């Protein structure tokens, strides 16, 4: 579409794209959307296996996990899905230690999602707290993986459709470092940037050595919430954070009043919330319906929930996401929205996730230590943040003495061999994400003696209370 036409249409589209946020009583529309969606699901193989029939209430549908959909994705048949089978793309998402999971996602659903959220997203990204600064043709820089991952497909769809509202740079097939170099060369021409906080503060800002003048800075890094003031100082705008994934597609939009937070777009997803204490193990196939689920209109500020998502753009129904979110507000006053606002809190499963790039579980860490020749009494590992960098920190008690440098070298070398994502992340972000702290002999024994309740060691993401108890059990 010619730029002049888009410029003429912009005021009308801005009104249309933003006005829905001010609806006060959206519950009736939400209920209608999920009923319509379940009628479509009832006609599919996935729906039949879930027991969904015309008129089935969402409250009666089982909660689902990846293992339920895996047979459909690996051996699809005509009639299994909402859209014709030829409409589906085979998309990869990061699994654990470089072993990706496969999803089938419909091109039509992807495009419908972009049409509903795209302009609202664009206007919110450039909202400076007082006004929207977006102009037709703004240059948007992104440094996210291309190829078979979801971001690459989004880029292909947008460019093929010739939307014309933004100019996207650079080519998504460039390497990570080539994209960084592109930004360093062209940063004065860029209006909106999407990258990790680490890339911004460690690789971009030190080389430019002057504040940027961006209309918007977009990231999925959890550290954006903590470093929001520093990001404002560096980029000229507070960070905008979204929630999206291969499983759900883009289902959330950035809050303006609460930098680093987001709200779920009820036009594209039916979002339910399971209180943290009832969170689910995603190793299951399905989970029976539960009355513990809270609708979006029932969440409470300060409470932490596991997200249960039914995206309208694909075939997942009541999908238990491996993520915990915290409700920080029931509205965003700056944009006049009564939709609850959330921030990303943590993984719901026992995984260590660094920069949403590499994922490591307990069994894999045990294998790494064993194959590295490390004889240990026990260990625990967790994600820690230092400034903009995310690390995996391991606390290890050894059976036999070993020099700390040798231990670090062995474990790090094995991680580099074992996990391509671990190796690539270190190369891209230019730091080593491993930390190790040696614990004195007898630490875990003393810890278990002092610990109340079940005498168990959480090897992944130990609670802060138990970690403090462990640290105080060293002598």
Q: Which positions does each model-derived feature cover?
A:
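Active-site glycine/GP-rich loop and adjacent strand/helix microenvironment
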Residues: 1-44, 157-475
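Conserved helicase ATPase motor motifs in RecA-like P-loop NTPase domains
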Residues: 91-97
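Short small-residue beta-strand/loop micro-motif enriched in glycine and branched aliphatics
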Residues: 99-103, 351-353
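Short coil/turn connectors at secondary-structure junctions
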Residues: 100, 135-138, 213-214
């Amino acid at each position: 579409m010619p730029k002049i036409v888009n410029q003429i249409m912009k005021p009308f589209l801005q009104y249309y794209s933003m006005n829905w946020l001010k609806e006060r009583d959206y519950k009736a529309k939400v209920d209608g959307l999920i009923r319509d969606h379940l009628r479509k699901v009832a006609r599919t193989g996935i729906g039949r296996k879930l027991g969904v029939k015309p008129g089935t209430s969402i409250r009666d549908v089982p909660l689902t996990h990846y293992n339920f959909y895996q047979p459909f994705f690996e051996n699809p048949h005509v009639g299994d899905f909402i859209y014709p089978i030829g409409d589906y793309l085979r998309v990869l998402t990061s699994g654990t230690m470089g072993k990706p999971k496969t999803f089938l996602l419909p091109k039509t659903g992807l495009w419908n999602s972009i049409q509903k959220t795209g302009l609202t997203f664009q206007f919110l990204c450039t909202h400076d707290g007082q006004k929207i600064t977006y102009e037709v043709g703004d240059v948007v820089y992104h440094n996210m993986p291309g190829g078979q991952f979801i971001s690459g497909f989004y880029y292909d769809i947008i460019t093929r459709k010739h939307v014309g509202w933004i100019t996207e740079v650079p080519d998504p097939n460039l390497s990570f470092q080539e994209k960084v170099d592109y930004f360093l060369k062209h940063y004065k021409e860029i209006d909106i940037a999407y990258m990790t906080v680490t890339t911004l503060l460690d690789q971009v800002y030190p080389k430019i050595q002057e504040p940027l003048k961006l209309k918007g800075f977009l990231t999925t890094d959890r550290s954006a919430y903590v470093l929001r003031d520093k990001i404002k100082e560096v980029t000229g705008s507070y960070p905008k954070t979204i929630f999206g994934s291969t499983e759900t597609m883009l289902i959330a939009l950035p809050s303006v009043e609460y930098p680093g937070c987001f709200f779920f777009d009820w036009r594209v997803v039916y979002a339910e919330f399971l209180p943290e204490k009832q969170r689910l193990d995603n190793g299951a196939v399905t989970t029976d319906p539960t009355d513990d689920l809270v609708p979006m209109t029932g969440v409470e500020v300060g409470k932490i929930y596991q997200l249960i998502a039914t995206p309208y753009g694909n075939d997942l129904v009541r999908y238990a996401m491996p993520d915990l979110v915290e409700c920080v507000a029931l509205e965003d006053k700056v944009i006049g929205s009564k939709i609850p606002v959330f921030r990303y809190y943590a993984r719901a499963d026992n995984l260590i996730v660094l920069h949403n790039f590499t994922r490591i579980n307990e069994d894999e860490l045990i294998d790494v230590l064993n194959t590295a020749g490390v004889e240990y009494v026990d260990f625990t590992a967790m994600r820690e943040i230092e400034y903009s960098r995310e690390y995996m920190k391991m606390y290890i008690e050894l059976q036999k003495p070993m020099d700390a440098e040798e231990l670090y070298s062995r474990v790090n070398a094995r991680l580099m061999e074992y996990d391509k994502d671990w190796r690539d992340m270190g190369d891209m972000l230019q730091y080593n994400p491993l930390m190790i702290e040696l614990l004195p002999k007898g630490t875990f024994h003393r810890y278990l003696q002092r610990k109340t309740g079940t005498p168990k060691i959480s090897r992944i993401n130990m609670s802060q209370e138990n970690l403090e108890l462990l640290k105080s059990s060293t002598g």
